Structure formats: structure tokens, C-alpha cells
Swiss-Prot record:
GO terms for biological process: defense response to virus. Residues 1101-1437 are annotated as: HEPN-like fold 2. The lineage of its organism: Bacteria, Bacillati, Bacillota, Clostridia, Lachnospirales. It is an enzyme of class 3 (hydrolase). This is CRISPR-associated endoribonuclease Cas13a. Its EC number is 3.1.-.-. The keyword Nuclease applies. Pre-crRNA processing is metal independent, while crRNA-guided target RNA cleavage is dependent on divalent metal. It comes from Lachnospiraceae bacterium (strain NK4A179).
């Protein structure tokens, strides 16, 4: 039972209660609590009594729908055998009901209490291994009642009830199939199944002997326990109360892995085992490699003992110092069988008998279980009898690992989806369990390190203190850490990783246009200023001086200003003023680089010395920001003009609207439905024409270009409405009340009689009318449910804005439907429909109603458009800028804040899509943090974490939002001057030739392009698109692909636009212009032509080019996210490991514990190793080490890369290490040590964007290596690699079927000659060769039906395949699946099989049934007897 997703009934509609769990501090101890979401009930928190009563109520309500058998409603069953099985199940469940129908029909409360007491006693007896069923006399009833109760649950009563309802004779095979296929999962225990089988065999008078089974004890009693949720009732409450965070402070002020409450004093053996494991974690953290090796060998012997028995050679010689990793590798290929698999069941046609396969799978699970029990028992016995020191001296620790192994095997067979020979091998199981154990230990150290970093390092950057102490828990956390504190850590880490990705792309975009890097200096941000000279030769530039890498110093400023709209927009900006005193454009580039570098150095948890320093030209950056805000006001106005609004409305009306919308800078709230969700673009024309809405009509009867101008009008109106929605509607004070009135209209006047009347009418209505009435009833109930929820939110939170109301509704909706890591495809959404869809739908409907009313009341001029000539651009509101100053306050704050300048510069070097995603993520972060503080406050929990609800790195998050929002509006806006982006027309024409086949003849590119564009395309229509007569036309997508894409990559994966593409575009444009503004089209051909026209438009305008570039960026961005995730986990692992080492009894040198630095700035660091580890990973934090030349202690400046700092850490470690490598201590359980250099190489390859410079491996190859190497310490992350890859592509409507194949990987690198040391097999991600790629389908409504159209055509899918495989060659002949069949409809029951299909099959089957009845050989419950010869023939075949 998922407490976090509890639902309660509300007049037929389901309503989210959102009862959640949390960990809070109670009187210097931690306790799990259950609380209701405060957004619904205000301050609400449950005590022990409330919690138990609440859980009991939830469990009891679920019992009303209890069924022993699940009914497979979605299965297409057309053969007699399958219909028979399902009919048997329905009869048992619905007509017979076994015990439950009798129990639920008893009105006497005493009966109910007695049944419940009986179930509790039965569970207690079973736990205490007491044989026999409990006596009803002990359940608080008299003797007569006890006898009656015995009769109800007697085996005889069961048998009689079955015979009375199902009087057919069935075979043993049929019973096996029913149990295997339909039995409720919680009842799938071997003895329960055997008890049920015995009962059914007796009921059908079939011979069956199983003397070991007592039907009442092994089936009936267990059903009662399951029905009353006895086990869950006792365990759910206890698990909530005992819930805790991974790490908590102990009494001595140190962190420790948490264990269950009770401890060894209570005699709790499991707690004693966990205490032994805590001791193991402490002891394993040793700098002595011999100690760690010995402990790993002992653990390894336990695994070998469990799977191979005590006679294995590795257990014979206790003194053998074997290598555990070599043993692990050797046993992985062991083909010995852990269990003997039963033979697969095949039908005569060669296909698998699915029902028989279910039985086989259950048999396999039981074989696994029995073998696991046997292994467990012999392992326990061997450990108890061992006197030779093979295993750990602590018996409780041995038992802990044995229990972990047992649980690991159980988990494998419990989740078995398919029976495979591979998973039945001892080699697979034993080494899977070994890796699980290693992962488990690694994750514990990571959890410890995370707690240390966040709660015990307050003085990490106290640079003004001469003595600091690290590893000491902050006083405010001594009483415990709440779950809300941990949630804030999660929010902070996500923000840091996402920001790191955007910083990497900003650096990449700036450097790709300005410098040419080499392999030794591949990090642009680490290049030194132009004045940096060589240390050994002061007359020579340093090797990493930025001057050595410039592409073209003369055009440097113009190159940079490409990202700011083009240099033509900056002609009046006084660069000379800000670059005076010997500064030039190289200093300008260095300033931008330093801003981005400082952003990369930011840690939002600790302020380093490089944090907020602003060592760049702050005046220049702030002046640029101010200049762009002035430009922004012009951009706002120009967008009105470019969207043709002055063609349909008066300039005076538009001027008033412009001032009203943009006089203030408006923040967009997160989780509020976007405008294009509220108003779907394709339906927009019909909606605004509707007289019940706005009734807008544009008179174009005399217009020769009616179709084209009508399309312009609706596009203009759509843009205007979008701007009003975000800048006026959502922030209007009266809109909240308007929305509430609309949303609660039905709830305020809800009539139960109307509901009953509709239900009565449905019963007597015909099929067509019944469908309409049922839809009317569902809408009525849903509107009431939604209205009641809105009323409740307003009642509990009277001060909430419309945006906050929307946030809560969408948060609840998303919480119910975001449980799956893998994104749902359109087909899966039809099969597995989202819960609470009416919440989202009615939110959109009521927002739409309120918005249309808002338009009528505030902007009535919109209702009366008229067509007139478009004025000159210069005459459209020429004085607009003097009326609005939306950024006045923000300008001054940016001028005084280094932090805001960082956000400004980083966001300005992002592509439009990336800047938009960055803003969206910031909104999500802000909403998440706000929600954490809200829940913590309402549950009475004080949050001690340093993350402020309304700030990031000390600045107001609203200002950060406004800065990024400005960049979003400006990113992607380009000038109309070719010279802003290319040297001249010829260079531009040459560049566009990579993507356009303009039949270049080998001479001048510009002339060839001109001739091509002046040639005929179709009829009298010229090609024209790319030339205006005198000069080439500047294409926005070409410019964006130049700035943010990679030409060499894009030209290889795309097909060039051809003359035939342009001809098809013009033909479709002419044809579709006649019906493009209809909204809902008349025919399937019209809709498909519109879709095809949009595809061709995207091709000829190079929009697809930006699509491919964005997909590549998303794939690269995810890889960068992973390297920072892994680096964070590595830091936390090392912190946790060395924190344990600091606090155990192992030998440690003085400088490991305390570092007393005597230099320019004397400093003493207690907990030195913790500081040094943090300094390795936190940019800007200096690291102390012994200089290799002077052998004196020195301190770095903290600005080196992590790789350089690791070298410094090694020199620090030489001051105390004796027998081992301090950096690598314990690392053997985090990663494969032999692959460390390969992992480092992969990390640098990703971070430095080497894919785009070398193209020596494919994206699939990189993702495969990340899957294989990166996350060996956490299998959860590893499994998510292909899932996230799938999700990225699905966001672009591309479905890919990935599969794993065997590949090769390199182990180790000879750093001198770069030769590969060793080759080894590995898993590789690829795409299924046949039907591996297919498009999502869009659903379009027609006037008389529905049509499904592929979202992506074959050409697009081919480019995606090339994108994933480039530079590898791939055969795409059969890889793309063209879906001829329709997408599953809305009434789908699963796997593309609709209710209509099922009804048709049922009609056909009814005819078949009537025929069988006449022959006297069908189900007697349906009017005949079964022809068992026919059934058995089906079974045999």
C-alpha cells in the first residue's frame, strides 16, 4: 500500500488525499510520521493513534473490492479454452465469492470482529510456527456463534458453493492454468496454491492426494489474513514510525548508518546484525590495503560458500590470499546450473503455450526458492561450525551478509519476468549477488559522505579563521536530520548539475567561434589572460596563453557579438569607454570567459574564495545588460509588427495594449499550464469564431489573398492572446475570483437528484443515447469533484494566487502519474491512462473560460478586427520605448551583483531551447523548494539547512529568473544583416550549400544560389526562398545552426534540401491554403496534407536542422550531467570512507588528521583529509601539498582543474602514506580500479566536447561506455542509462527499441605511447535491426471521425538514426517501422484492441456459443455441457 498515493471516494469520483510520510526530530530522536498534505487540510499531523486508525481505514476500504482471482479484462480471448478459463474465474469471484460473499453479507458487527480476530490469531500462529487453525471460541463469541462461523469457512461449505455455481467437470490441467494465470499476487505462495488446488480438485470430484496440505490452514486461513491485511496492518504502521534517513548523528556527536530501533538490548537479532555491519564499515575504512583485502576475502568466501558449498577450493586453504576480483571474473562464466529448468511448452505450430509457460514460470520460482532455502541453511550451518577463521570473527556480521545474499536471490526470482537459461546459472547469480553486496557497501559510504559534506563542514571555507575543525556535526543537527533537510540537498544537487551542464554549453559555444584548442589545452575556461608569460622565459608567452589559440583577432568582437544579435545592433554602444587603458577585444573575450569560469566554480552550498569575486570588467557587463534591456523594449514591439497585428487592428489600440503588457517585468510561475495547452493552436480559429466564445469574424470576402490573409490573422491573434495570457491575465487581481467562480459553478449547485436521474436514464437508454448520457454523467461528477477541490484549496489557503492554485492542482496530478522512470509513448498512454485526468482537463477548460471573459471585459477592440494595409515598421508606435521601463530596477541590481552577471552571460551563450529549458528548470527548482518549506512548516518541522527558500547564492531568485527570462526572449533573435554573421554573401552562400542543393556549378556560390532561386519551381512560381533579388536571404535556422550546432556533424546526418522538396512544398502550400484555417478538417486527406505541408515547410526552412542540433545537445547535456553526478558521488564516497577512517582505531599519520600549515597565511585544519578531498572537487578551494621541487609545504590557488588537483593530492598524501595509495583507498568498491584511467579519459572526452572535434565514436558508443563503466557503484543509475536515452528521443516523438549486444572495451591505457593494454567483452547499446525505430502518432479529430498520423516522417527518422550512429555506417533498410495500423483508440483495453473490437468478437462468439448449445456441448452455466474432447485437444496442441 502506497501511503503517499492514498485516495478516497467522493460521490463516485476519486479524490487525492496525499497522505505523506516524513522523518522529523522528536526530543533528540528521529521518528517517521504520517501527515496529510497541508494544502488540503491546513496544519495536520497524525499521532500514533491517528496513524493506526487511518491505516486500518485505508486497508478496510480496499477490502470491498477484494478478489481471490484477478480478471484479465484486457486479454483478447477468442478461442473456447480462454473463454472458458475467464468464465470460471468470473463465477468463482462474482457468484460464488467463496468466504467473502458470506462474510460481507453478515450485518452483525460481532461476526465481523470475530472474523478479524480469527485472522489475527491465524497470523500470530503462523509467525510462531504453531500448527493448526485457531479456535473461534477464543475470538470473543459464544459457542453457537463459533459453530456458525466454523461452518462458513469450512472446506465443505467452499466445495458446496462451487458445485452449486459451476457444475462442470474440469480437468487438473484447467485448474493449474487458472491458478497460474489468475490467482491474486499476494496469494501466490506455494502452500496456498497447493491448498487451493486441493480444494478445487475436491470440488470438481477429481482424484487428488496431497496429505501434507490442510486446506483450511493453508488456503482458507491465509485468504482471511490477506483479506484483513493483518500483516500489512502490523508492519505498515511500524515501518512508518521506524522510518529514518540513511545517516543520523549518534550520542557521541558522530554520524552513523541508521539501524532499526530496538538494538541488541532488546534481543533483536537483525538489529544486532546491522550493528555488526556498522562496525564492518568502520573497520573497512583503513589506509592499510592488507586489512581491506582480508575483509573482502572473508566476504567473498561467504558468497562462494552460499553458492558452491563448503567443499569449494577457495574455502579449503584459509591462508590463501587470492584476488577477489580475479575470482569474481572467473566465476562469471561458470555455466553450472543453480536449478534445473523444466522444459519449455510449445504448441503444434511452434509457438509458446502462454498458460503453460505461466505454470512453468511459477515452477521455476519455486525451484529457486527451494534451492535458496537449501543454500541458506547449509551456509548458516557452515559458518556456525567454522573454527578456522575462514569468515568474519563476528557471527552477527556473517549472518548479516548471508541474509543479504538470501534476500538478493529472492529478489531475483520474485521479479522474474522471463525464464532464461542464463539466469539459472550459478555464475550469473553468484556474481550478481557479489556486485550487489559491493554496491550496498559503496552506497552506505556515499550516504555517510553526503551527510558529512552537508552537516559537518561549516568551517570549510572560513578563510579568516586560523584554526578550523571539519567533521564536527553542526549543533543544529545534533538532535537529528529531517527528511525535509535531505529533500533540500536533493534540490540543491539537481540545481548544481543542471547549471553545470548549461555552463559547459555556454563555454563550448563561445570557444567554438573564437579559439582553436588543442589536446593539451582542451579546457577553454582555464586559458590564461594575454599578459601571462612562460615561467622559465619571461619573453615568451605561456603555453596556455589565450593569444596562442585565437582564430581571428581582427574580427573577435564581431564574432562574440553574433551571440548578442549581431554587431550592427551594437554600433552605438561605447565599447571604447569600457575597454580603455590598454584593453582590447581579447580582454573582452577574457572577461566573458572569466564570468563563465566563475559560474562553473560556484557551489551553492559553500562560498569559495572565487565565489562573488567579480574579477572581470563588471562595468562592461552591466552596461551590456542595460543596452539589451533597451533593445528588449524594441523587440517586444517588433514582434507585434512581425506577427502582422497592425494589419488587423488600429495602432492606437495596439499601443495601449503594448504599454499595458510590458510596463512591468512579469515573472512566469511554474506549473501553470502553458498557453498552447489552454488554447490548442489547430483548434484556435474555430474556437474564437464560435459565437458562444468570442465570435470574432474577419471580413475578407473581397480579398484576393483571402486564404493567406486569414492564416496571417489567426496567427497574429494567437500571438497576441499568448502575450496577454502571460503578461496580464495570470497576474490580474480579479482573475483568481473569476476562475474560482467558473470552476466551482457545478459544485456550488450540485444536485444529487440530477445524478440519480441520469443513472436511471442510462439503464433504459439505447446504445447511442446511453453513450451520450454516460459521458454527461461522468462530466457532471468530474466537474463537481474538481470544484470541490478548488473550494477546499481556497478555504485552507485563502491567500493563494491563481498561479499557486494551478501549481497545487498540477503538482497533485503529476505526483499521481510520474511514478515510472520511463516516459510513456502515445500508445502506452492510451493503454495505461493517467489518473485524475479530469483535474488537468478541467483546469484547462476553466482557465480558457476565464481568459475569454477577461478578453471581452478588458480588450474589447480585439473582437472587431478589420483588414487594412500594413504600415511601415518605423511608423508603428515609434515612441514606445519612452512609455515603458520594465527593467529599471533590475538594471541597478545587475550592476551591483556579480552573481546576476554570471547568470546573464551564461544564459546569453545558450541556444534558444537551452535558455528556455534553463528557465523552466529554475521555475521547477523554485517550486520544489517552496513546496518543501511549505510542508515542513505546516507539519511543525524546523529546517536547518542553509538553502534559502527565495535565494540562490545570496541573490534573490526572482532577479535570477528575470535575468534568464530576458535572455530567453533575446536568444535566437537575429539581425537582418549577413555581415553580422558572415564575411560576405559568397561565404554565406558557401555555408548554406552544406544543407541546400542549389546545383552548384563549381564557380561562384552566390551566383549559383541566385540562379537556382530565380529558376522555376512549379508553374510560374520561382524557387525564390533563399534570395531576394540582390542578396541571399538570411535564414534564421542557418544562423542558429552556425552559432549553436556543428556543421561537420549536421551535414553528415541530413539530406540536403533539393529542388523536388521545394516543388512539393509549393504544391502543398497552394492546396492547403484553401482549408488551412478550418481547425477541424473534413477529410483524412486534408489533415494528412496539412501535416505533410508542415513537414516540408520545416525542411525547406531548415527547421529540422535545429531539431537535430537540439537532440544532439540534449544527448551531450545528459552525458555532462552524468559526469557531474558521478563526480559528486565520488567525492561523497571518499568523504564518507575517510570520515569513517578518521573515527576508527586504525593507524593514521599526523597530517592525515591535522594539517598545520606555516606559510604566508598560517592555518591549522583539524580533519585535514576531509578538507583536502573537498578541495580536489570544489573549484576555488585551495589544496595544501608538498612541493616536488622544494619539498616544502605549499598551497595552490584553487583554480586548477580536478585532474591537476588530484596530482597535488598525491603529493599531500606522500606525507603520511606507508603501504597504500591514499587516493585509491577503498576505491575498489566504487569502481573497477583497472579501468580508472579509461573512466577518466571518458569523463574528459565528454566534458571537453571532444565528440564534436573528432567524431571518432558514436553517441550510442558513448552511452554504451557510460552504461558499462560509469555507474558500477550504483546499479539503479546504470539501469537508467538506456531509459533516459529512450526518453530524450521520445520527447521528439521518436520511439526507439534498444537492445544489448556483445561488444569490446579497452582496459587500461599506457600513458606514454597511448597503446591499449587489454581488450575485454562488454555490453553495447544498439537499435534493433528490424522495426527498431518508429514515429509517435498524433491524433486528429475530423468532422466525422478521427485520424492518426505519424508525427515524424521516414526522412526525419533516418536522420535520427544517422545522428545516433555517426560516424558508424548503419543499414536502415528494415530498421524503420512504418505503422499502417491506427494508434489504439481512447476506449482501448490494451495492445491496440478496442472495446468496439471486443464487442464485435463477443457477438461472433455468441453465435458460436448458440451453435454449441444446440449441440449440447458448451458451459452448463451458459446452457449446456462442455465438450471435453475438444478442450483437451486444444491443450495437447
Amino acid at each position: 500500500m502506497k501511503i503517499s498515493k492514498v485516495r478516497e471516494e467522493n460521490r463516485g469520483a476519486k479524490l487525492t488525499v496525499n497522505a505523506k510520510t516524513a522523518v522529523v526530530s522528536e526530543n533528540r530522536s528521529q521518528e517517521g510520521i504520517l501527515y496529510n498534505d497541508p494544502s488540503r487540510y491546513g496544519k495536520s499531523r497524525k499521532n500514533d493513534e491517528d496513524r493506526d486508525r487511518y491505516i486500518e481505514s485505508r486497508l478496510k476500504s480496499s477490502g470491498k473490492l477484494y478478489r481471490i482471482f484477478n480478471e484479465d479484462k484486457n486479454k483478447r480471448e477468442t478461442d473456447e479454452l480462454q473463454w472458458f478459463l475467464s468464465e470460471i474465474v468470473k463465477k468463482i469471484n462474482r457468484r460464488n465469492g467463496l468466504v467473502l460473499s458470506d462474510m460481507l453479507s453478515v450485518d452483525d458487527r460481532a461476526f465481523e470482529k470475530a472474523f478479524e480476530k480469527y485472522a489475527e490469531l491465524s497470523y500470530t500462529n503462523r509467525r510462531n510456527k504453531v500448527s493448526g487453525s485457531p479456535a473461534f471460541e477464543t475470538c470473543g463469541v459464544d459457542a453457537a456463534t463459533a459453530e456458525r462461523l466454523k461452518g462458513i469457512i469450512s472446506e465443505t461449505n467452499f466445495i458446496n458453493r462451487i458445485k452449486n455455481n459451476i457444475d462442470n467437470k474440469v480437468s487438473e490441467d484447467i485448474i493449474d492454468r487458472i491458478i497460474a494465470k489468475y490467482l491474486k499476487k499476494s496469494l501466490c505462495r506455494e502452500r496456498v496454491k497447493r491448498g487451493l488446488k486441493k480444494l478445487l480438485m475436491n470440488a470438481f470430484d477429481l482424484p487428488y492426494s496431497d496429505p501434507d496440505i490442510d486446506v483450511q490452514r493453508d488456503f482458507i486461513d491465509y485468504v482471511l489474513e490477506d483479506f484483513y491485511h493483518v500483516r500489512a496492518k502490523s508492519q505498515v504502521s511500524r515501518s512508518i514510525k521506524n522510518m529514518n534517513m540513511p545517516v543520523q548523528p549518534e550520542g557521541d556527536g558522530k554520524f552513523a548508518i541508521t539501524v532499526s530501533k530496538g538494538g541488541t538490548e532488546s534481543g533483536n537479532k537483525r538489529s544486532a546484525e546491522k550493528e555488526a555491519f556498522k562496525k564492518f564499515l568502520s573497520d573497512y575504512a583503513s589506509l592499510d590495503e592488507r586489512v581491506r583485502d582480508d575483509m573482502l576475502r572473508r566476504m567473498r568466501r561467504l558468497v562462494v560458500l552460499y553458492f558452491y558449498g563448503s567443499d569449494d577450493s577457495k574455502l579449503s586453504d584459509v591462508n590463501e590470499k587470492f584476488d577477489v576480483w580475479e575470482d569474481h571474473a572467473a566465476r562469471r562464466v561458470d555455466n553450472r546450473e543453480f536449478i534445473k529448468l523444466p522444459l519449455e511448452n510449445k504448441l503444434a505450430n511452434g509457438k509458446t503455450d502462454k498458460d503453460a509457460e505461466r505454470i512453468r514460470k511459477n515452477t521455476v520460482k519455486e525451484l529457486y526458492r527451494n534451492q535458496n532455502i537449501g543454500c541458506y541453511r547449509q551456509a548458516v550451518k557452515a559458518v556456525e561450525e567454522d573454527n578456522n577463521g575462514r569468515y568474519f570473527d563476528d557471527k552477527m556480521l556473517n549472518m548479516f551478509f548471508i541474509h543479504r545474499i538470501e534476500y538478493g536471490v529472492e529478489k531475483i526470482y520474485a521479479n522474474l519476468k522471463q525464464v532464461t537459461e542464463f539466469k539459472a546459472r550459478t555464475g550469473y547469480l553468484s556474481e550478481k549477488i557479489w556486485k550487489d553486496l559491493i554496491n550496498y557497501i559503496s552506497i552506505k559510504y556515499i550516504a555517510m559522505g553526503k551527510a558529512v559534506y552537508n552537516y559537518a563542514m561549516d568551517e570549510l571555507n572560513a578563510s579568516d579563521k586560523k584554526e578550523i575543525e571539519l567533521g564536527k556535526i553542526s549543533e543544529e543537527y545534533l538532535s537529528g536530520i529531517s527528511s525535509f533537510d535531505y529533500e533540500l540537498i536533493k534540490a540543491e544537487e539537481m540545481l548544481q548539475r543542471e547549471t553545470a551542464v548549461y555552463v559547459a554549453f555556454a563555454a563550448r559555444h563561445l570557444s567554438s567561434q573564437t579559439v582553436e584548442l588543442d589536446s593539451e589545452n582542451s579546457d577553454f575556461l582555464l586559458l590564461k589572460p594575454k599578459g601571462t608569460m612562460d615561467k622559465n622565459d619571461k619573453n615568451k608567452l605561456a603555453s596556455n596563453n589565450i593569444l596562442n589559440f585565437l582564430k581571428d583577432k581582427e574580427t573577435l568582437r564581431d564574432t562574440i557579438l553574433q551571440y548578442f544579435g549581431g554587431h550592427s545592433l551594437w554600433t552605438d554602444f561605447p565599447f571604447d569607454k569600457y575597454l580603455a587603458g590598454g584593453k582590447d577585444d581579447v580582454d573582452f573575450l577574457t572577461d566573458l570567459k572569466d564570468v563563465i569560469y566563475s559560474m562553473r566554480n560556484d557551489s551553492f552550498h559553500y562560498a569559495t574564495e572565487n565565489h562573488n569575486n567579480g574579477k572581470w570588467n563588471k562595468e562592461l557587463i552591466s552596461a551590456m545588460f542595460e543596452h539589451e534591456t533597451e533593445r528588449m523594449t524594441v523587440v517586444m514591439k517588433d514582434k507585434f509588427y512581425s506577427n502582422n497585428l497592425p494589419m488587423f487592428y488600429k495602432n492606437d489600440d495596439l499601443k495601449k495594449l503594448l504599454i499595458d503588457l510590458y510596463k512591468d517585468n512579469v515573472e512566469r510561475a511554474s506549473q501553470v499550464p502553458s498557453f498552447n495547452k489552454v488554447f490548442v493552436r489547430k483548434n484556435f480559429p474555430a474556437l474564437v469564431r464560435d459565437k458562444d466564445n468570442l465570435g470574432i469574424e474577419l471580413d475578407l470576402k473581397a480579398d484576393a489573398d483571402k486564404g493567406e490573409n486569414e492564416l496571417k490573422f489567426y496567427n497574429a491573434l494567437y500571438y497576441m492572446f499568448k502575450e496577454i495570457y502571460y503578461n496580464a491575465f495570470l497576474n490580474d487581481k480579479n482573475v483568481r475570483e473569476r476562475f474560482i467562480t467558473k470552476a466551482t459553478k457545478v459544485a456550488d449547485n450540485y444536485d444529487r437528484n440530477k445524478e440519480r436521474n441520469l443513472k436511471d436514464r442510462i439503464k433504459s437508454a439505447g446504445s447511442d443515447e446511453k453513450k451520450k448520457l454516460r459521458e454527461q454523467l461522468q462530466n457532471y461528477i468530474a466537474e463537481n469533484d474538481f470544484g470541490q477541490r478548488i473550494k477546499n484549496i481556497v478555504q485552507v489557503n485563502p491567500d493563494y494566487t491563481l498561479a499557486q492554485i494551478c501549481q497545487l492542482i498540477m503538482t497533485e496530478y503529476n505526483q499521481q502519474n510520474n511514478g515510472c522512470m520511463q516516459k510513456k509513448s502515445a500508445a502506452r498512454k492510451d493503454i495505461n491512462k493517467d489518473s485524475y485526468q479530469h483535474y488537468k482537463m478541467l483546469l484547462l477548460v476553466n482557465l480558457r473560460k476565464a481568459f475569454l471573459e477577461f478578453i471581452k471585459e478588458n480588450y474589447a477592440f480585439v473582437l472587431k478586427p478589420y483588414k487594412h494595409d500594413l504600415c511601415d515598421k518605423a511608423d508603428f508606435v515609434p515612441d514606445f520605448a519612452k512609455y515603458v521601463k520594465p527593467y529599471a530596477g533590475l538594471i541597478s541590481r545587475v550592476a551591483g551583483s556579480s552573481e546576476l552577471q554570471k547568470w546573464y552571460i551564461v544564459s546569453r551563450f545558450l541556444s534558444p531551447a537551452q535558455a528556455n529549458h534553463m528557465l523552466g528548470f529554475l521555475h521547477s527548482y523554485k517550486q520544489y523548494v517552496w513546496d518543501i518549506y511549505r510542508r515542513a512548516s505546516e507539519t511543525g518541522t524546523e529546517i536547518n539547512h542553509s538553502i534559502a527558500e527565495d535565494k540562490i547564492a545570496g541573490v534573490d531568485i526572482t532577479d535570477v529568473d528575470a535575468v534568464i527570462d530576458l535572455s530567453v526572449k533575446l536568444c535566437g533573435t537575429i539581425s537582418s544583416e549577413i555581415s553580422d554573421y558572415f564575411k560576405d554573401d559568397e561565404v554565406y552562400a558557401e555555408y548554406i550549400s552544406s544543407y541546400l542543393d542549389f546545383e552548384y556549378d563549381g564557380g561562384n556560390y552566390k551566383d549559383s544560389l541566385n540562379r537556382f532561386c530565380n529558376s522555376d519551381a512549379v508553374n510560374d512560381q520561382k524557387v525564390a526562398l533563399y534570395y531576394d533579388g540582390e542578396h541571399p536571404k538570411l535564414n534564421r535556422n542557418i544562423i542558429l545552426s552556425k552559432l549553436y550546432g556543428e556543421r561537420r556533424f549536421l551535414e553528415k546526418i541530413t539530406d540536403r534540401v533539393s529542388r523536388s522538396d521545394i516543388v512539393e512544398y509549393y504544391k502543398l502550400k497552394k492546396e492547403t491554403s484553401q482549408y488551412q484555417t478550418k481547425g477541424i478538417f473534413d477529410s483524412e486527406d486534408e489533415q494528412k496534407n496539412i501535416k505533410k505541408f508542415q513537414e516540408m515547410k520545416n525542411i525547406v526552412e531548415f527547421r529540422d536542422l535545429m531539431d537535430y542540433s537540439e537532440i544532439a545537445d540534449e544527448l551531450q547535456g545528459q552525458l555532462i550531467n552524468w559526469i557531474y553526478l558521478r563526480e559528486r558521488d565520488l567525492m561523497n564516497f571518499q568523504l564518507g570512507y575517510h570520515y569513517a577512517c578518521l573515527n576508527n582505531d586504525s593507524n593514521k599519520q599526523a597530517t592525515y588528521v591535522t594539517l598545520d600549515y606555516q606559510g604566508k597565511k598560517n592555518r591549522k585544519i583539524n580533519g585535514a583529509i576531509l578538507y583536502q578531498i573537498c578541495a580536489m572537487y570544489i573549484n576555488g578551494l585551495p589544496l595544501y601539498y608538498v612541493d616536488k621541487d622544494s619539498s616544502e609545504w605549499t598551497v595552490s590557488d584553487g583554480k586548477e582543474s580536478t585532474g591537476a588537483k588530484i596530482g597535488e593530492f598525491y603529493r599531500y598524501a606522500k606525507s603520511f602514506e606507508n603501504t597504500s595509495d591514499c587516493y585509491a583507498s577503498g576505491l575498489e568498491i566504487f569502481e573497477n580500479i583497472s579501468e580508472h584511467d579509461n573512466i577518466t579519459e571518458l569523463r574528459n572526452y565528454i566534458e571537453h566536447f571532444r565528440y564534436y572535434s573528432s567524431f571518432d565514436r558514436s553517441f550510442l558508443g558513448i552511452y554504451s561506455e557510460v552504461f558499462d563503466r560509469f555507474f558500477t557503484y550504483d546499479l539503479k543509475y546504470r539501469k537508467n542509462v538506456p531509459t533516459i536515452l529512450y526518453n530524450i528521443l521520445l520527447q521528439h516523438f521518436v520511439n526507439v527499441r534498444f537492445e544489448f549486444v556483445s561488444g569490446k572495451k579497452m582496459i587500461g591505457i599506457d600513458k606514454k605511447d597511448r597503446k591499449i593494454a587489454k581488450e575485454k567483452e562488454c555490453a553495447r547499446i544498439t537499435i534493433r535491426e528490424k522495426n527498431g525505430v518508429y514515429s509517435e502518432q498524433f491524433t486528429y479529430k475530423l468532422k466525422n471521425g478521427t485520424v492518426y498520423v505519424d508525427a515524424r516522417d521516414k526522412r526525419y527518422l533516418q536522420s535520427i538514426i544517422r545522428l545516433l550512429f555517426y560516424p558508424e555506417k548503419v543499414n536502415m533498410d528494415e530498421m524503420i517501422e512504418v505503422k499502417e495500423k491506427k494508434k489504439p483508440s481512447d476506449n482501448n483495453t490494451g495492445k491496440g484492441y478496442s472495446k468496439r473490437d471486443r464487442q464485435q468478437d463477443r457477438k461472433e462468439y455468441d453465435k458460436y456459443k448458440e451453435k454449441k448449445k444446440k449441440e449440447g456441448n458448451f458451459l452448463s452455466g451458459m446452457g449446456g455441457n462442455i465438450n471435453w474432447d475438444e478442450i483437451n485437444a486444444q491443450l495437447k496442441n
